Amino acid sequence: MGLQFLAPGEKVFPSLHRIIISTFALIAAYIFIVRPLRNILFHPLKKYPGPKLFGASSIPYGFYYMTGKWHLKIRNLHATYGPIVRIGPDELSYACPEAWEDIYGRYVPTKRRENPKPVWYCSPDAHDMVGASLGDHGRMRRVMAPGFTYSAMCKQEPLIKGHVDMFLSKLCSLCGDGRAEVNILDWLTYCTFDLIGDLSFGEPFGCMENNMLHPWLQLVFANIYITHIILLCQRIPFFYLFLPIKTTYQLWRDFRRHVVLLREVVERRLSLSTPRDDFLDVMTTKQTSTLYMTKEEIFKNAILLTGGGAETTSSSLSGMMYMLTMRPDVKEKILEELRDTFPSEDDINMRSVAQLTYTGAFIEESMRYYPPGPNTMWRITPPAGNTILGDYIPGNTIVGIPHRVLYRSEAYWKDADGFRPERWLPDSQRPAEFDEDKREGFHPFSYGPRACIAMNLAYAEMRYILARFLWHFDIEATKESKKWMDDQKAYLVWDKPGLFVHLKPRAGVKVAA
């Protein structure tokens, strides 16, 4: 009966075309209007200061991260809004040293749950310490800890010394009898990856021998941008629209091929019956029913130690080399300390360099000024939420501390943008103007039970390499490298251009063959 009221030619049902358009319009209205308004007006984090646009959607954050300039934007946001800033609908950034314990500290029953790493950042299925669950992380860390003790470092020193000898010898051959222009970043990368690779896989990558990065490492360094955009896409699927499909597929294919080759290296090392005092020795000996590592965990942690350990060390050392070229006064103070402490190069070893007070202060200041991990190491509150700085934070909130922002904050550091190694000297030697610096808030290797297990080894290596390098060479900036730090892009690590310097061997100093 009702059909008789329809106008001539009018359809009972709308066309499929109109249904599709209406559906997309509703979805778009929800994504771009309803959800952003809900995030601004009704979200549990609405009380925290920050730009409304960032509180409405994660997309503005994602665009800044894609450009590699997020470390600059987040500093401006903290300067405008204060130490706690809402930078996404469900994300808070803390630029205050008091937050380290609450965000990265250990699980304390009845007081604080652990804030795990988000699965899009570090998956528990990765079989390494970074993404492992609380129990698996503790088990793996207890297995590996003996490899990073003082006594283990002493056993590893001959191997480390051999690689540093080759590093110095290669630089000396490049210089010949005079001054040479050298990309010191490349050679620091070759040295640290050969060294850590030898400790992790049982053989070096051959970077110094071949004057080039191993193909696996070339793949990693040539695709820093793509690998970090993939990480961003896993967090914010919208950015898959900007992912170059062909390049990403080639990267995935090449990684799979190199993983097969690296597995063969590990198998070859594990088949050896002779102990080498390396990390694989530690991971495979004295295993029990509760203290063990599977073969997959051994392999994945070997990759983790190589990539994470070597990149952090080479990045930090390159920052130090740059500062030596820009601050000749600081370089002279380090040289004076070396000459006063060591009668000869034979006295320089990984234990004796620990007594270098000013050199140690220089290393700390270099990592404050140019932290190897400039941005945030993300954590996420558990589903039941957590308490941070006395405030309840809802579950599944992303939280973290941006290293570079905290270390350059005038609220916590005197002359924060100045390079002042003396701020790290012992109390009796430190100028009074730095007494209020928040040195206890400085954690370049992270904080808590998941802090870098190789931190002490990294510090010893950096002191040792730096001391022996300056014993052998004078270093000066080239014209093109004087602004080396100025325009670098930053993701989880720095995307660094070549650091070209002038090297000149010191008269009368010979390098071991």
From Swiss-Prot:
<dbReference type="GO" id="GO:0005506">
    <property type="term" value="F:iron ion binding"/>
</dbReference>
<dbReference type="GO" id="GO:0020037">
    <property type="term" value="F:heme binding"/>
</dbReference>
<dbReference type="Pfam" id="PF00067">
    <property type="entry name" value="p450"/>
</dbReference>
<comment type="pathway">
    <text>Mycotoxin biosynthesis.</text>
</comment>
<dbReference type="GO" id="GO:0004497">
    <property type="term" value="F:monooxygenase activity"/>
</dbReference>
<keyword id="KW-0479">Metal-binding</keyword>
<feature type="transmembrane region" description="Helical">
    <location>
        <begin position="212"/>
        <end position="232"/>
    </location>
</feature>
<feature type="transmembrane region" description="Helical">
    <location>
        <begin position="13"/>
        <end position="33"/>
    </location>
</feature>
<keyword id="KW-0812">Transmembrane</keyword>
<keyword id="KW-0472">Membrane</keyword>
<dbReference type="InterPro" id="IPR036396">
    <property type="entry name" value="Cyt_P450_sf"/>
</dbReference>
<dbReference type="InterPro" id="IPR002401">
    <property type="entry name" value="Cyt_P450_E_grp-I"/>
</dbReference>
<dbReference type="GO" id="GO:0016020">
    <property type="term" value="C:membrane"/>
</dbReference>
<dbReference type="InterPro" id="IPR001128">
    <property type="entry name" value="Cyt_P450"/>
</dbReference>
<dbReference type="InterPro" id="IPR017972">
    <property type="entry name" value="Cyt_P450_CS"/>
</dbReference>
<keyword id="KW-1133">Transmembrane helix</keyword>
<protein>
    <recommendedName>
        <fullName>Cytochrome P450 monooxygenase sthF</fullName>
        <ecNumber>1.-.-.-</ecNumber>
    </recommendedName>
</protein>
<dbReference type="GO" id="GO:0016705">
    <property type="term" value="F:oxidoreductase activity, acting on paired donors, with incorporation or reduction of molecular oxygen"/>
</dbReference>
<keyword id="KW-0349">Heme</keyword>
<feature type="binding site" description="axial binding residue">
    <location>
        <position position="452"/>
    </location>
    <ligand>
        <name>heme</name>
    </ligand>
</feature>
<keyword id="KW-0408">Iron</keyword>
<dbReference type="InterPro" id="IPR050121">
    <property type="entry name" value="Cytochrome_P450_monoxygenase"/>
</dbReference>
<comment type="similarity">
    <text>Belongs to the cytochrome P450 family.</text>
</comment>
<keyword id="KW-0503">Monooxygenase</keyword>
<comment type="function">
    <text>Cytochrome P450 monooxygenase; part of the gene cluster that mediates the biosynthesis of the phytotoxin stemphyloxin II. The first step of the pathway is the synthesis of dehydroprobetaenone I by the polyketide synthase sthA and the enoyl reductase sthE via condensation of one acetyl-CoA starter unit with 7 malonyl-CoA units and 5 methylations. The C-terminal reductase (R) domain of sthA catalyzes the reductive release of the polyketide chain. Because sthA lacks a designated enoylreductase (ER) domain, the required activity is provided the enoyl reductase sthE.</text>
</comment>
<keyword id="KW-0560">Oxidoreductase</keyword>
